[in-house]
């Protein structure tokens, strides 16, 4: 379940029977150990930085900008992942995952990272008519169908955009309260049934309830 070398959507035969931890696919539990900020693996592993790679690139660009001029004002927009350092707040539309031409809300931010995640631009239908996308639940290996879009605002001292990027993806499978116990961030979530929720200090609002 994924993409081929031409970046077109493909499924291997019987993919549903071979994906996810419940079907015997390897998980991190027995493959790694955490020692503070050090990750130790017990064998060869493949690391996919797709969940935070674009955000990390934004942070690297910001680091160079800051090194060149510490008081520089800027907005780095990597298409859904932004890092903002401005004197006045900028307004950001929360894109409707069902219709990219419309917004479901707005946010305002002047300092920090603001990242969104949604399968609206990466989805396809298999031969059996199943709707598939790239945001998978590691437990069963199939696309998450309960969440339509997420937005995260974060202002940690370093790697703000990488963190916000990863958290926006993690919200598809992990409750916000569980993530907020480990990371400082604000978020908004739009579910598949068009229900909207947001954390108390999220810097924006939805047009619907």
Annotated model-derived regions:
Residues 1-209:
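Mature catalytic core of soluble alpha/beta enzymes
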């Amino acid at each position: 379940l994924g993409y081929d070398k031409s970046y077109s959507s493909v499924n291997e035969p019987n993919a549903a029977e071979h994906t996810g931890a419940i079907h015997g696919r390897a998980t991190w539990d027995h493959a790694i150990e955490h020692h503070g900020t050090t990750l130790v693996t017990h064998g060869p592993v493949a690391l996919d930085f797709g969940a935070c790679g674009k955000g990390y690139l934004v942070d690297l660009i910001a680091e160079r900008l800051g090194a060149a001029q510490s008081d520089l004002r800027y907005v780095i927009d990597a298409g859904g992942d932004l890092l903002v350092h401005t004197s006045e707040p900028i307004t950001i539309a929360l894109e409707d995952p069902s219709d990219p031409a419309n917004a479901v809300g707005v946010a305002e931010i002047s300092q920090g990272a603001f990242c969104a995640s949604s399968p609206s631009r990466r989805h396809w239908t298999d031969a059996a008519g199943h709707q598939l996308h790239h945001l998978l639940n590691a437990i069963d290996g199939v696309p998450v169908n309960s969440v339509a879009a997420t937005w995260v605002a974060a202002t940690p001292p370093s790697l703000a955009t990488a963190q916000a990027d990863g958290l926006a993806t993690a919200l598809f499978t992990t409750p916000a309260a569980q993530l907020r116990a480990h990371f400082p961030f604000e978020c908004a979530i739009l579910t598949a049934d068009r229900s909207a929720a947001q954390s108390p200090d999220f810097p924006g609002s939805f047009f619907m309830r």
